[in-house]
Design a protein with these regions (language model features):
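Active-site-adjacent helix/loop patches that line small-molecule binding or acyl-intermediate pockets
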Residues: 1-86
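A penicillin-recognizing enzyme superfamily signal
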Residues: 24-28, 73-241
Length: 241
C-alpha cells in the first residue's frame, strides 16, 4: 500500500486449490488465480479493457483492481456484461426504448440499427433480413463467446448453481468483497442482462456467508423468473470460427 505495507490476496474461505484451468478458476471464483493472471498479462492491459468496457473511466493499474478494488456502479457493470452478451459489440444504455405518437407511429427509437427488408409482408424464399450493426466491436466475437461459456459454468458447476433453477441458458458471475460487505451477481441470457448488488450505504459486514451466490443470486432468480415468463428458452449464439 501507500505506506509501504503488503497486500496479500486470499481465496474466499482461505486455502489454496493448486493449479487449475482458467475455466475452473472462474467457476469457483478463485482470487489468487485471477491475480496471477492479471500480473502475467500486465495491469496496464487489464485497465485498458476495463475502460474499453466502460467499467471505469480511469483505472489505476494496480493488482488489487483485478479483484474489483475500484468503485463502480451497477449500471456500468451491467453495460460491460452486455458487451459480452452482445457478441463483443458496445452497448449504450438508455431509459427510453422508443417513443410513439398517438397514432402508433414511431417517432424515436434508441436502437438505430437499419434493416432494409424487415418490413417485407410476405416470404417467398428470399434470404433472411439482416440488421446493419455499426456499433463498435470492442471484443472479438469468439472471445466473447468463450467468456460466456466460462460464465455458464459458474451457473452449472460453480458459485451460482442455484441459478440453474431458472431452467434456461444463463451465464453470470458472483462477487463478494472483503469481510462480506458487498454481494454481487451479474448474469445474462441471450436476450437480457441483469445485475444485483447488495450492501449497506456505509460499508459494513452483512454477516457470515453473505456472498454473491447466497444473497444476490436469489434476487436475480426472482427477477428473471418474471422477466422471462412465457418466453421460449434460447441458446447462446456460437460465432463463426
Amino acid at each position: 500500500d501507500g505506506n509501504g505495507g503488503y497486500w496479500t490476496p486470499q481465496n474466499y474461505g482461505g486455502g489454496y486449490a493448486g493449479p487449475s484451468t482458467l475455466r475452473l478458476g472462474i467457476e469457483k471464483s478463485r482470487n489468487l488465480m485471477t491475480v496471477r493472471l492479471a500480473k502475467d498479462m500486465g495491469m496496464d492491459l487489464v485497465a485498458a479493457y476495463a475502460e474499453r468496457f466502460g467499467i471505469y473511466d480511469h483505472l489505476k493499474p494496480y493488482l488489487p483492481m483485478a479483484l474489483g478494488a475500484g468503485e463502480t456502479t451497477v449500471l456500468r457493470m451491467v453495460t460491460a456484461y452486455s458487451v459480452i452478451a452482445n457478441g463483443g459489440r458496445s452497448i449504450e444504455p438508455s431509459l427510453i426504448d422508443r417513443v410513439q405518437d398517438r397514432y402508433g407511429r414511431t417517432v424515436y427509437k434508441h436502437d438505430q440499427r437499419f434493416c432494409a427488408d424487415c418490413n417485407t409482408r410476405e416470404y417467398d424464399g428470399q434470404a433472411e433480413p439482416q440488421l446493419v450493426d455499426e456499433r463498435d466491436q470492442v471484443l472479438d466475437p469468439m472471445t466473447a463467446y468463450q467468456i460466456t461459456s466460462m460464465m455458464e459454468g459458474v451457473v452449472q458447476r460453480g458459485t451460482a448453481t442455484r441459478v440453474k433453477a431458472l431452467g434456461v441458458p444463463v451465464a453470470g458471475k458472483t462477487g463478494t468483497t472483503n469481510d462480506e460487505k458487498d454481494a454481487w451477481f451479474v448474469g445474462f441470457t441471450p436476450d437480457l442482462v441483469c445485475g444485483v448488488y447488495l450492501g449497506y450505504d456505509n460499508p459494513q459486514p452483512m454477516g457470515h456467508g453473505a456472498t454473491g451466490g447466497g444473497l444476490a443470486a436469489p434476487v436475480f432468480i426472482d427477477f428473471m423468473k418474471e422477466a422471462l415468463k412465457g418466453k421460449k428458452p434460447v441458446d447462446f449464439k456460437v460465432p463463426e470460427g
